[in-house]
Amino acid sequence: MDILALFQDAMEKLPQRVVIHKRTPFKNDEIEGITNALKQAGISEIDLITITQEYDLKFIAEKIMYGQFLEDGYPVDRGTCIKLSSRNALLWTHGVVPSIQSNRRYYQGGRCIPAPLKITKYYGPGDLETIAKEILGFTKMNWNSFNLYTKLPATIDTSNT
């Protein structure tokens, strides 16, 4: 039984939208094969996304004090997203989050400057903001861990193991 049949059996209908994440670039024949198969099954909303780690890019937060930009001493906030083009964005899935103490911030791991994920959209109607929010949500789906989040979304992280 293929994945579409399993989904239809469980949900009694096919999904309206399919998003595929992978770590390597999509080749033209992959795009054609995936989109043709899904369209034949009646699925028209298809997004094909690559997610890679950009280890060489590091940013720290800045704050404005006395009219000047100063280093904040902390990494950028988790969820920071910089759109590079209509197809590419940088997303920080690891970074500062609000603490339960109102005057503090929490940085999981407490050291090193986090590197962003590079999101590249190869195909589909989905906007990068929605895609980035979905990827960020998938970083909170590792139920085998007590961590607040993982650096990689579950769609990529589980394929690494």
PLM-predicted stretches and their roles:
Residues 1-161:
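Long, contiguous domain-sized segments
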